């Protein structure tokens, strides 16, 4: 049986850890002058994926 392919977009965005699946928030690259300080601060930490979305991401990453 051939190897399963990982979804390349998902493999670049998500990382499996012992506590769950880690991801980085979007809209933090450029043109940040429009955003408030509070908004930028809230987007700062890496977050864990919600439980309802974990199964879908793990299907995209068969070897995670």
Swiss-Prot record:
GO terms for biological process: translation. Residues 1-22 are annotated as: Disordered. GO terms for cellular component: cytosolic large ribosomal subunit. The keyword Cytoplasm does not apply. The keyword Hydrolase does not apply. It holds the Pfam family Ribosomal_L35p. GO terms for molecular function: structural constituent of ribosome. PROSITE patterns: RIBOSOMAL_L35 (PS00936). PANTHER family: 54S RIBOSOMAL PROTEIN BL35M, LARGE RIBOSOMAL SUBUNIT PROTEIN BL35M. Belongs to the bacterial ribosomal protein bL35 family. This is Large ribosomal subunit protein bL35. It comes from Aliivibrio salmonicida (strain LFI1238).
């Amino acid at each position: 049986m051939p190897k399963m392919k990982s979804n390349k977009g998902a493999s670049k965005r998500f990382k499996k850890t012992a506590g769950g699946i880690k991801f980085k928030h979007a809209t933090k690259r450029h043109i940040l002058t429009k955003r408030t300080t509070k908004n930028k601060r809230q987007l700062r930490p890496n977050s864990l994926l919600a439980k309802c979305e974990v199964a879908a991401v793990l299907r995209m990453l068969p070897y995670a």
